[in-house]
């Protein structure tokens, strides 16, 4: 980004810079204060298209074949300013794509290549992304040519796919549809270390519940993370903490790849397939490498890692510090990686940069030099490559792939496709002529509606039938919210479409009140059966639609306002649900329903903000939803915490009015734990209310209090109701990628 050189002179630091955004900040005074910045990301003001650009339409107008042809040409169009190894950029672009997508983690769905974040800090300056700025610069003429029809997010991944194809590999397919963002993501927790490649914090946190931080073969990584070091995508290729121990490295590999939702077979396929191509770079002293893009001077124009070792490029290039070429044909698809892995015995060696690696013992020099045809070298491997041989489970898979090349190719194609698309969400988002026909379970597939959808006349009758079941309206509201609010925008999983709330694992989550949920689902199944069997001109309705419709009908009753509804959701089956990874959507705590409490590291209100970010909520939307959900009484298990109203079940702004009432004093009510509070009358001392941290934050955090005051005003009672209905409708439709935004029914008052 170009650091200001003057800030380093005369002991000037950022706190002394008299310019916008500098000086001592609120976060310096109150580092643990609740921050709302993650709820203001990716807004229209930071988007040059003002959020009105239809990327799907633009992509569908793209000459896809011409783009791929240009990318294929680029692979062998070596540039003097960054020459291609072996005259082919294939391995380079594979690494770029892999590192763009490989930050994904299944725990919270964040990371991944879905937003083109590799262009921004910190990812653009991670040590593991060294010199990938050059890969993006090589792509720029193509991006410039095709413009808005191909996003950076799609291009960064498509380039890797084309790279594989240009070297003789048959890929599984490719789907476009990733719209670009225009600012660095602030929501992802990458760890607590403040030094590149450090890992003390993540393993200290990981071993709090057991394990030994010094036991490299068994240590536990922080549950929130998926990389073994700050600034790495997965693991240290030299081995755990730089120790060249392949068996210990296998433990780190299994942990980090597993947190990307990859099993052992997919992990072996990815490593063995990816390392069939290209090389690593460690030609000399790494101290001669300059600062990363974000730390480079302004004249570098975002070009980082400039090296003073020789020419700094080609045969003099230094990236990871490792100097490894895996096969004798690094620009061709082959089984040579696995062949060499088992054919040779390996001995510890050091790269010219001093990094730990391995070289084939007593082997001939059969590996070509990337720039000098007259030179050869012995086969080399990374510590983490040897894990595929010396870890018993990995070895079994690796030997099977060695003996069955077609099986290996298919496994790599599938694993690579999953790597690039895991955070794409439902197939309705997938665009382009290379979308594979095979449905994969990790897509969270939902059936296509093969029937006529209901209209307004049908909806009126269905609402009557819903209320005729005798189920309390609040239970319909609770189920609709639980279903829709399971969505997370990070990887587009969850949501109401599919009605997975009636399937394992969601149906058994404590937060969803399984007994009440079963009652609601049974009632709605009766309504569905009656309607669908009546053969209303071929019309049918799904349970997914009925869950939302029932919630909407109950909200109309509670608010007196019309609530828009867009039909078309369908019902997934248990066989279409990947239970083990869906379990990661289960909330530890949920402030929207006053469920759970703070952890030893995160306060309940911070968990609430994190959840609001995953729901793409703005601060006003978060505020109005909390106020409305409390008034409606939608707490977990019927709790009265935060229900600051004597009209429970009616949509009102009472939560804000009573929260801000200065006649009430709040006191801890849980023995000093600071999770539950009583609101008592200042004069009489009589208890009036109870609340949690997720409630009181709307009176304590200044920005949230300002919004609470807005909704508590006498002239904003109606505005509150309308804003709540609008925000409710947004959440109900967050996963409706099957419908254009312009076709989703909007609240009209």
Curated annotation (Swiss-Prot):
It comes from the Eukaryota. It is found in: Cytoplasm. There is a cross-link at residues 98-234 (Tryptophyl-tyrosyl-methioninium (Trp-Tyr) (with M-260)). The keyword Nucleus does not apply. Its EC number is 1.11.1.21. Its cofactor is heme b. GO terms for cellular component: cytosol. It holds the Pfam family peroxidase. Keywords: Cytoplasm, Heme, Hydrogen peroxide, Iron, Metal-binding, Oxidoreductase, Peroxidase. GO terms for molecular function: catalase activity; heme binding; metal ion binding. There is a cross-link at residues 234-260 (Tryptophyl-tyrosyl-methioninium (Tyr-Met) (with W-98)). Heme b binds at residue 275. It catalyses: H2O2 + AH2 = A + 2 H2O; 2 H2O2 = O2 + 2 H2O. Formation of the three residue Trp-Tyr-Met cross-link is important for the catalase, but not the peroxidase activity of the enzyme. GO terms for biological process: cellular response to hydrogen peroxide; hydrogen peroxide catabolic process. Binds 1 heme b (iron(II)-protoporphyrin IX) group per monomer. The record marks 95 as: Transition state stabilizer. The active site is at 99 (proton acceptor). InterPro entries: Catalase_peroxidase, Haem_peroxidase, Haem_peroxidase_sf, Peroxidases_AS, Peroxidases_heam-ligand_BS. PANTHER family: CATALASE-PEROXIDASE, HYDROPEROXIDASE I, BIFUNCTIONAL CATALASE-PEROXIDASE. Homodimer or homotetramer. Belongs to the peroxidase family. Peroxidase/catalase subfamily. Bifunctional enzyme with both catalase and broad-spectrum peroxidase activity. This is Catalase-peroxidase. The gene is katG.
């Amino acid at each position: 980004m170009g650091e200001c050189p003057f800030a380093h002179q005369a002991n000037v630091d950022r706190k002394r810079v008299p310019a916008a955004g500098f000086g001592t900040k609120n976060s310096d005074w109150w580092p643990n204060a609740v921050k709302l910045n993650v709820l203001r990301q990716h807004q229209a003001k930071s988007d040059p298209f003002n959020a009105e650009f239809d990327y799907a339409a633009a992509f569908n107008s793209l000459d896809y074949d011409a783009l791929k042809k240009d990318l294929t040409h680029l692979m062998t169009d070596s540039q003097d300013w960054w020459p291609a190894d072996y005259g082919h950029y294939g391995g380079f672009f594979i690494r770029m794509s892999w590192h763009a997508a490989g930050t994904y983690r299944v725990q919270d769905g964040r990371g991944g290549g879905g937003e083109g974040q590799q262009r921004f800090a910190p990812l653009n300056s991670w040590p593991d992304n060294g010199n990938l700025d050059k890969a993006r610069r090589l792509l720029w003429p193509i991006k410039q040519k095709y413009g808005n029809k191909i996003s950076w997010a799609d291009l960064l991944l498509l380039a890797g796919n084309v790279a594989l194809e240009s070297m003789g590999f048959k890929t599984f397919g490719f789907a476009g549809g990733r719209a670009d963002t225009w600012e660095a993501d602030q929501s992802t927790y990458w760890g607590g270390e403040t030094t590149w490649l450090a890992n003390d914090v993540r393993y200290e946190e990981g071993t709090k519940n057991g394990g030994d931080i010094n036991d490299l073969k068994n240590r536990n990584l922080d549950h929130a993370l998926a990389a073994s070091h700050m600034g790495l995508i997965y693991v240290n290729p030299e081995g755990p903490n730089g120790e060249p121990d392949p068996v210990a490295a296998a433990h780190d590999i299994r942990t980090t790849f597993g947190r990307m939702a990859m099993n052992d077979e997919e992990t072996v396929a990815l490593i063995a397939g990816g390392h069939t191509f290209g090389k690593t770079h460690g030609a000399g002293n790494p101290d001669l490498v300059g600062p990363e893009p974000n730390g480079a001077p302004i004249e570098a124009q975002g070009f980082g890692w400039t090296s003073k070792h020789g020419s700094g490029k080609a045969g003099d290039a230094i990236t990871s510090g490792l100097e490894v070429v895996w096969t004798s044909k690094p620009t061709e698809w082959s089984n040579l990686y696995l062949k060499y892995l088992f054919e040779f015995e390996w001995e510890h060696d050091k790269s010219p940069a001093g990094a730990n690696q391995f070289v084939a013992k007593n082997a001939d020099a059969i590996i070509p030099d990337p720039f000098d045809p007259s030179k050869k070298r012995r086969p080399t491997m990374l510590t983490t490559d040897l894990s595929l041989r010396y870890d018993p489970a990995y070895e079994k898979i690796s030997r099977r792939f060695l003996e069955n090349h077609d099986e290996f190719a298919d496994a790599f194609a599938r694993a690579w496709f999953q790597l690039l698309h895991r955070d794409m969400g439902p197939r309705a988002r997938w665009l382009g002529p290379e979308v594979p026909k095979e449905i994969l379970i990790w897509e969270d597939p939902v059936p296509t509606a093969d029937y006529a959808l209901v209209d307004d006349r049908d909806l009126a009758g269905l609402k009557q039938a819903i209320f005729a079941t005798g189920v309390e309206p609040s239970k319909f509201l609770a189920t609709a919210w639980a279903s829709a609010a399971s969505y997370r925008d990070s990887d587009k999983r969850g949501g109401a479409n599919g009605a997975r709330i009636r399937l394992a694992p969601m149906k058994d989550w404590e937060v969803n009140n399984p007994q009440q949920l079963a009652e609601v689902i049974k009632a709605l199944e009766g309504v569905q059966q009656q309607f669908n069997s009546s053969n209303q001109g071929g019309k049918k309705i799904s349970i997914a639609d009925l869950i939302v419709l029932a919630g909407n009908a109950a909200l109309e009753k509670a608010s007196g306002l019309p609530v828009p509804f867009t039909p078309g959701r369908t019902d997934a089956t248990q066989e279409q649900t990947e239970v083990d990874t869906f379990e990661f959507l289960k909330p530890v705590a949920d402030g929207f329903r006053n469920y759970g409490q703070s952890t030893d590291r995160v306060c309940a209100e911070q968990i609430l903000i994190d959840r609001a970010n995953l729901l793409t909520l703005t601060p006003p939307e978060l505020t109005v939803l909390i106020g409305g959900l409390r008034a409606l009484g939608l707490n977990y298990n019927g709790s009265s915490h935060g229900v600051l109203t004597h009209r429970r079940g009616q949509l009102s702004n009472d939560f804000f009015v009573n929260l801000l009432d200065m006649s009430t004093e709040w006191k801890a009510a849980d023995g000093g734990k600071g999770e539950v509070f009583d609101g008592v009358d200042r004069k009489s001392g009589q208890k009036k209310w109870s609340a949690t941290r997720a409630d009181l934050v709307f009176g304590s955090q200044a920005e949230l209090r300002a919004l609470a005051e807005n909704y508590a005003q006498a002239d904003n009672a109606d505005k509150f109701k309308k804003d709540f209905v609008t925000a409710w409708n947004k959440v109900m439709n967050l996963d409706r990628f099957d419908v254009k935004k312009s076709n989703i029914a909007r609240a009209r008052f």
